[in-house]
Amino acid sequence: DAQLRTEYSVKALTDAGVEVEQLDLQRGDWDRNKGQEICQNDLAKYGDQIEVVFCNNDDMAIGALQAIQAAGRTVNKDIYLVGVDALDAAKNEVAKGNMTGTVLNDAKGQATQAVECMEELLGGKTFEADHQSVYVDYVKVTPDNVKDFQ
């Protein structure tokens, strides 16, 4: 899931016509301190070349935010920061303008889809071998809609 998150985040930018140069890709092990350390090191190495930081969870994004602020950069002004999970702490940072956004891994949508698949199976429907996975779209949480999720 995390590899796909990264791949499709970059793809969304390129599909929108944004030129992308990936400066670094590291594992933050879902850890705030590691996210801060990686971002701090990258900011020291790449400086203003860094325009966007994608983190595959909000805790790492909050760590990255700490590094960004310590480096004197301003999210949504000279750098963008996106996390995943729509944790309360991240939604608060989005509302304050300190994060560009987060992405909700839609548990309610997943549950609904699971029930629909179960009903289809109980009704006798079979699924082909190459259709064994069902993907539920993530939900973007931005400053424009964050109040809907708090």
Feature-to-residue mapping (PLM):
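Hinge/cleft segment of the Venus flytrap/periplasmic-binding protein
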Residues: 1, 11-16, 106-150
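Extracytoplasmic ligand-binding site segments that recognize negatively charged/polar headgroups
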Residues: 1-12, 20-21, 27-33, 111
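Class I S-adenosyl-L-methionine
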Residues: 7-17, 65, 69, 95, ...
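Hydrophobic alpha-helical
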Residues: 9, 24, 28-92
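Conserved beta-strand scaffold positions in the cores of enzyme catalytic domains, especially
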Residues: 22-25, 81, 102, 140
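Short beta-strand elements at the ligand-binding edges of bilobed clamshell
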Residues: 25, 96-108
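Flexible loop/hinge segments that line or gate small-molecule binding clefts
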Residues: 85-100, 139-141
